[in-house]
Amino acid sequence: MTSQPVPNETIIVLPSNVINFSQAEKPEPTNQGQDSLKKHLHAEIKVIGTIQILCGMMVLSLGIILASASFSPNFTQVTSTLLNSAYPFIGPFFFIISGSLSIATEKRLTKLLVHSSLVGSILSALSALVGFIILSVKQATLNPASLQCELDKNNIPTRSYVSYFYHDSLYTTDCYTAKASLAGTLSLMLICTLLEFCLAVLTAVLRWKQAYSDFPGSVLFLPHSYIGNSGMSSKMTHDCGYEELLTS
């Protein structure tokens, strides 16, 4: 069996901003599903941005509820530390900004928006990490606070009717109910924070690849006879954006 001669071909690497062939000379697309894949990717990133905004609004709403609610002195220390850290208000700000930049970048892909979305995603991931640590610590302190609440409720002084009535009014809310409501609120904030951290890291990786890709060009396989057509070889000689790899 004799080997057939293989015609010479040229591999030309072209930047995406200089590919402008005429309609008659343009090669046929080899993978039509790539455009569909890009459209699905853009749609998924928009969905990710929307989820980030919703997470930010959820954490902000729960933070406002915690700030306006009143708890027994045993649980006040748990909520006051969380509110003093300002995470329920600063964290959602970064979440909403990051999600908005992700959506805006997909609508109009520019270098400035890509870098802005990258910075926003990094800040959002860092704030979510800090918030996750704070919420985990505060949720771990709920059990000791609930036990102390039960002890204080059982040790109400009964020296006089006035004193008993005063101390009893402080503990009209059941300790278990207060613990359950706080645990539910902190759990929702923790879930939204963890989800935001994962989405922010994913978005940051995508934006990093977009912003600092080594060669954002296209690879075209053209026959050797195409090089002599329409002065392509002379153009490649003077244009440093082309890289020609000849195979014999």
Swiss-Prot record:
Which subcellular locations apply to this protein? Membrane
Example GO BP = cell surface receptor signaling pathway
Database matches in Pfam families: CD20
**Where do transmembrane segments lie in this chain?**
47-67, 85-105, 117-137, 186-206
InterPro entries in alphabetical order? CD20-like, MS4A
One GO CC term, this protein: plasma membrane
This protein's source sits in the domain of life called Eukaryota
All ranges on the Cytoplasmic side of the membrane: 1-46, 106-116, 207-248
- Write the record's keywords in alphabetical order, separated by commas: Membrane, Receptor, Transmembrane, Transmembrane helix
Give the function comment from the record: May be involved in signal transduction as a component of a multimeric receptor complex.
Which PANTHER family does the record cross-reference, listed alphabetically?
MEMBRANE-SPANNING 4-DOMAINS SUBFAMILY A MEMBER 6A (PTHR23320:SF135), MEMBRANE-SPANNING 4-DOMAINS SUBFAMILY A MS4A -RELATED (PTHR23320)
* Stated family: Belongs to the MS4A family.
> Protein name, please?
Membrane-spanning 4-domains subfamily A member 6A
According to its UniProt entry, this protein's organism is: Homo sapiens (Human)
Q: Could you read off the lineage of the organism from its UniProt record? A: Eukaryota, Metazoa, Chordata, Craniata, Vertebrata
